[in-house]
């Protein structure tokens, strides 16, 4: 117990571990050991996980070819990702799905363009009608009677018997 609390002893153990690790890593054959170990671990995991999964999938699936193809493509894509590649292997089914998706998107865009052009044509026709109604038409004489609200005003010649109805009359009242 005293040795565990001794600082010098602890430092000596750490130094011993570090020197051991450095001698292992300095060996040229051991320099790639972590990479080799990680690749072997991944391959072992894929082997242990994929074989039972493929057996079950082949027994339960009606189309075993597609299942095998999908599993192999998935394994290769995983290995490519581990190797650092951004490209992936795609099957014909995936390409067809992507093409169908692109075609649907293009159809949607074409329908939208068709709707927009129809609306624009309608707007142009509406603007033409508005312009035609707003066009200034030349007239010989402009009737201003509607504008100044004097349509029912009569001149002196038009009054009955030439009398002005608005002139005051002499009114006599009995008292």
Swiss-Prot record:
Glycans are attached at residues 8, 18. It comes from the Viruses. Residues 1-28 are lumenal. Keywords: Activation of host autophagy by virus, Calcium, Enterotoxin, Glycoprotein, Host endoplasmic reticulum, Host membrane, Host-virus interaction, Ion channel, Ion transport, Membrane, Metal-binding, Secreted, Signal-anchor, Toxin, Transmembrane, Transmembrane helix, Transport, Viral ion channel, Virulence. The N-glycosyl content is primarily Man(9)GlcNAc, with a small amount of Man(8)GlcNAc. Residues 52-175 are cytoplasmic. It is found in: Host rough endoplasmic reticulum membrane; Host membrane, Host caveola; Secreted. Ca(2+) binds at residues 120, 123. InterPro entries: Rotavirus_NSP4. GO terms for molecular function: channel activity; metal ion binding; toxin activity. It is a single-pass type III membrane protein. It holds the Pfam family Rota_NSP4. One of its GO terms (cellular component) is extracellular region. One of its GO terms (biological process) is monoatomic ion transmembrane transport. The chain crosses the membrane at residues 29-51. Plays an essential role in the virus replication cycle by acting as a viroporin. Creates a pore in the host endoplasmic reticulum and as a consequence releases Ca(2+) in the cytoplasm of infected cell. In turn, high levels of cytoplasmic calcium trigger membrane trafficking and transport of viral ER-associated proteins to viroplasms, sites of viral genome replication and immature particle assembly. Belongs to the rotavirus NSP4 family. Homotetramer. Interacts with the immature particle in the viroplasm. Interacts with host CAV1, early and late in infection. Interacts with host integrin ITGA1/ITGB1 heterodimer. Interacts with host integrin ITGA2/ITGB1 heterodimer. Interaction with microtubules blocks trafficking to the Golgi apparatus. Binds 1 calcium ion per tetramer. This is Non-structural glycoprotein 4.
């Amino acid at each position: 117990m005293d040795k565990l609390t001794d600082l010098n002893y602890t430092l000596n153990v750490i130094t011993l571990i570090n020197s051991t690790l450095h001698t292992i890593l300095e060996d040229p054959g051991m320099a790639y050991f972590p990479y080799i170990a990680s690749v072997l671990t991944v391959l072992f995991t894929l082997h242990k996980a994929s074989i039972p999964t493929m057996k079950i999938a082949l027994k339960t699936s009606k189309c075993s070819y597609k299942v095998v193809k999908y599993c192999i493509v998935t394994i290769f894509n995983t290995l490519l990702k581990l190797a650092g590649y951004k490209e992936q292997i795609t099957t014909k089914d995936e390409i067809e799905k992507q093409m169908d998706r692109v075609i649907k998107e293009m159809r949607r865009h074409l329908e939208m363009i068709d709707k927009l052009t129809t609306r624009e044509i309608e707007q142009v026709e509406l603007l033409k009608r508005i312009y035609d109604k707003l066009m200034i038409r030349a007239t010989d004489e402009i009737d201003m009677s509607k504008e100044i609200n004097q349509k029912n005003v009569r001149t002196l010649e038009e009054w009955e018997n030439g009398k002005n109805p608005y002139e005051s009359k002499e009114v006599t009242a009995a008292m």
